[in-house]
Amino acid sequence: MTDTNKLKDFRHRSSVYDSMVKSPNRAMLRATGMTDDSFEKPIVGVISTWAENTPCNIHLHDFGKLAKEGVKEAGAWPVQYGTITVADGIAMGTPGMRFSLTSRDIIADSIEAAMGGHNVDAFVAIGGCDKNMPGSMIAIANMDIPAVFAYGGTIAPGNLNGKDIDLVSVFEGIGKWNNGDLTAEEVRQIECNACPGPGGCGGMYTANTMATAIEVMGMSIPGSSSHPAESPEKKADIEEAGRAVVRMLELGIKPSDIMTREAFEDAITVTMALGGSTNATLHLLAIAHAANVDLTLEDFNDFQERVPHLADLKPSGKYVFQDLYNVGGVPAVMKYLLKNGFLHGDRITCTGKTVAENLKNFADLTPGQDVIMPLENPKRADGPLIILKGNLAPEGAVAKVSGVKVRNHTGPAKVFDSEEEAIEAVLTDEIVDGDVVVVRYVGPKGGPGMPEMLSLSSMIVGKGQGDKVALLTDGRFSGGTYGLVVGHIAPEAQDGGPIAYLRTGDLVTVDQDTKEITMHVSDQEIEERKKTTVIPPLYSRGVLGKYAHTVSSASKGAVTDFWRPERTGKK
């Protein structure tokens, strides 16, 4: 335990309650259990996205209690808070999906409001589902007080007939059922066995991608991103997060010391090597924006060209994230990449040690394992996340090409203004091999909320068309998506981007070799179409209306604040 008398000097924010005139404030705090002794200690917030509606988050309230124990053991005063979550897998394919990305910024704002409003000296943020991680990190960057992120852990794989399955197995089962390859009862068996307990979705999907990126950056406990939700190691790392944040206070380490340009470079490197989610581009841009780090969409292509894809992880591979844990986890991957010159080993982390110092305590990848391929024989010679540009996406678009055999595709567009219309077309066999399915007006402003298209993409894969039909959108894709898919097309249709003027029958080319996305329509014809195209009014009611009117382009991370360093300064 840290010397409490020494910790009194680190009450940089909670000391506002010390003076005589703050007696009323202290009266309220005494009602929560604080005493004269407590007021001598730093106040550390512990805020989680606990909720009972999803396996990703159902265990996080108990994890908050563990983090509090770590804070207490380190000599500070912990206070637990709660904020919201939106479960992507439950919202998917419904109107609720518009609230998913929106929730990222609500989480960020609510954490900042709770921690700032109560003058905490430091905090631990605990998250489990996709938007929890970037939402927490945006708040951490904006607050810039000692903070640690703690991940709720990955779910164990389900099992059916001796085979590992997961949530994406159910989504793809719908396509197979529609194609006549599975019966309704067989799909029900997959449904009933896919999710056996608590934890984030089990492949290299968005939750595990972002948890990994945060660990690589140095903002969570080493090894924690790959600890399964129900493992003893996970409980230990949650408690350690409480101790670590107090240590950050003592050492004077702030998130801005950790979240440097080099930290983001390493996060992108490991994301490429592991075959992470397309959502990593959106979220890392948003976190970098909050951290005042210069990061652009084009930077991702720089790393894509020099970092090979090594991991045989779902959605395009064989293994789930727990299998990576079994062969050494994220630290073993980092050790391998560091040894081969891909990472910055001298960066400081939330432990007070450098990346290289942290990794000394971990074993190498298990000899003979085949979850992570060697650099000499990678899954793919370059990274699987590609930024495309062209006259259909002048600001850029994001493609994930892991497991995709087709390197370029040209076909006629079939254009839909909603996912529901596109799903109906797939279910009624209107989509044929060679088509380019386009879903627009579902971007950050147009959705509003930039919904994911996992229901649609999984149906296409389930029907055996994953390599034969391209799917394009100004919306997003789940980390569980694979196939010939391109998302985040910017500018979006709602902003008058070229995708708004695409018509059914127009030829579209997606080329991963040239990194181009082209609509074969002349500039003159596009200008003519602009004269007759009516952009629908921007949604304006409630939280989605606020979001639609403030959110930036996906090419800038879909951020919702007005902070610009050249205009406002940042204190």
From Swiss-Prot:
Quaternary structure and interacting proteins, as annotated: Homodimer.
The protein's job, in short, is: Functions in the biosynthesis of branched-chain amino acids. Catalyzes the dehydration of (2R,3R)-2,3-dihydroxy-3-methylpentanoate (2,3-dihydroxy-3-methylvalerate) into 2-oxo-3-methylpentanoate (2-oxo-3-methylvalerate) and of (2R)-2,3-dihydroxy-3-methylbutanoate (2,3-dihydroxyisovalerate) into 2-oxo-3-methylbutanoate (2-oxoisovalerate), the penultimate precursor to L-isoleucine and L-valine, respectively.
Which is an annotated Pfam family here? ILV_EDD_C
Q: Which GO terms describe its biological process?
A: isoleucine biosynthetic process; L-valine biosynthetic process
Known catalytic reactions: (2R)-2,3-dihydroxy-3-methylbutanoate = 3-methyl-2-oxobutanoate + H2O; (2R,3R)-2,3-dihydroxy-3-methylpentanoate = (S)-3-methyl-2-oxopentanoate + H2O
Name the UniProt key words of this record, in alphabetical order.
2Fe-2S, Amino-acid biosynthesis, Branched-chain amino acid biosynthesis, Iron, Iron-sulfur, Lyase, Magnesium, Metal-binding
GO MF term list: 2 iron, 2 sulfur cluster binding; dihydroxy-acid dehydratase activity; magnesium ion binding
Q: Which residues bind Mg(2+)?
A: D88, D130, K131, E452
Query: Which InterPro entries does the annotation name?
Result: DHAD_IlvD/Edd, Dihydro-acid_dehy_C, DihydroxyA_deHydtase, DiOHA_6PGluconate_deHydtase_CS, ILV_EDD_C, ILV_EDD_N, IlvD/EDD_N
Question: Which family is this protein grouped under?
Answer: Belongs to the IlvD/Edd family.
Q: In which pathway does it act?
A: Amino-acid biosynthesis; L-isoleucine biosynthesis; L-isoleucine from 2-oxobutanoate: step 3/4; Amino-acid biosynthesis; L-valine biosynthesis; L-valine from pyruvate: step 3/4
Q: How is the cofactor bound?
A: Binds 1 [2Fe-2S] cluster per subunit. This cluster acts as a Lewis acid cofactor.
Cofactor requirements of the protein: [2Fe-2S] cluster; Mg(2+)
The residues responsible for catalysis, as annotated, are S478
In this chain, [2Fe-2S] cluster is annotated as bound at: C56, C129, C201
* Protein name as annotated: Dihydroxy-acid dehydratase
The keyword Cytoplasm appears for this protein: no
PROSITE patterns documented for this protein: ILVD_EDD_1, ILVD_EDD_2
Q: What is its EC number?
A: 4.2.1.9
Q: Where on the chain is N6-carboxylysine found, per UniProt?
A: K131
